[in-house]
Amino acid sequence: MIIKSAVLDVVCGITSKIPDTGLPEVAFAGKSNVGKSSLINGLMNRKALARTSAQPGKTQTINFYKINDELDLVDLPGYGYARVTPAEKEKWGKMIENYLHTSHNLKAVFLLIDIRHDPSANDRQMYEWILHNGYEPIIIATKLDKLKRSQVQKNLKAIREGLQLKKGTTVIPYSAETKQGRDEIWELIESLTGGEPSEEA
C-alpha cells in the first residue's frame, strides 16, 4: 500500500463507545512488549506515530490509526503484564471484548507472538478468545531479528504446536529492524479489505 497519510484518529478508553468510521478495520493483539507498536509503525512507515516503550503495559486504550482515509489499523491493549492489578487486567479484557463484539467493520485480527519464546498461557487464551468471537487469528511472529536464522523454523514450529494451529494457518515472521514480513502482512491486509497491494518506501 502506498502510505499517503497515517494519523491517530480515535482513542477509546473503557467507557468509550466503539466508533463506526465506515472504514474496514484490522486489529492487532498481543502480550505487553511483544512489539505491536513497532509493527504498526513499520506498516505505516512512521517512526513514532504509535508510541513504543520498553515498559510493558504502555497501551491502555484502543487506538485507531487511519491510513489514507481508507482503512484503520487498530492497536488493542497488551495483556499478560504481571505488574498490572487484577482490576486493570479485567478492565482491559472488557475493552477488547467490547471491541470484538461491537465493531461492525473488523475484517481480521492479527495475534502477535514473540518468536523467541513458546506461546504462553495468556497467548493461548487470547487465541481461543479470538476464535470464540468469530475470527480466525493470523499469527505474526515478532522480534525475528533477535533470533539466529538457524533457529527460525524450529521456533515457528513451536508456535504452531503451542497454539495448536490448524494446518495451513498463516504465520508470518516479522522483524521491526529489517521490515522482513511487512510486504506479506500488507498483501494480506489488502486482500482482506478489498484493496490492491502496492508499495512506497
What are these regions (language model features)?
Residues 1-83, 194-195, 199-201:
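Conserved G1/Walker A P-loop phosphate-binding module
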Residues 65, 142, 185:
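Residue-level signal for inorganic ion chemistry
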Residues 3-15, 146-201:
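Canonical P-loop GTPase G-domain recognition
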Residues 22, 48, 61, 88-92, ...:
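Helical mechanochemical/support elements of P-loop NTPase systems and associated helical scaffolds
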Residues 97-169:
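Conserved C-terminal guanine-recognition region of P-loop GTPase G domains, centered on the G4
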Residues 58, 71, 78-81, 116-118, ...:
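Conserved nucleotide-binding/hydrolysis micro-motifs of P-loop NTPases
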Residues 43-47, 100, 163, 189:
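Hydrophobic aliphatic residues
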Residues 18, 56-63, 77-107, 115-129:
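Switch II of P-loop NTPase G domains
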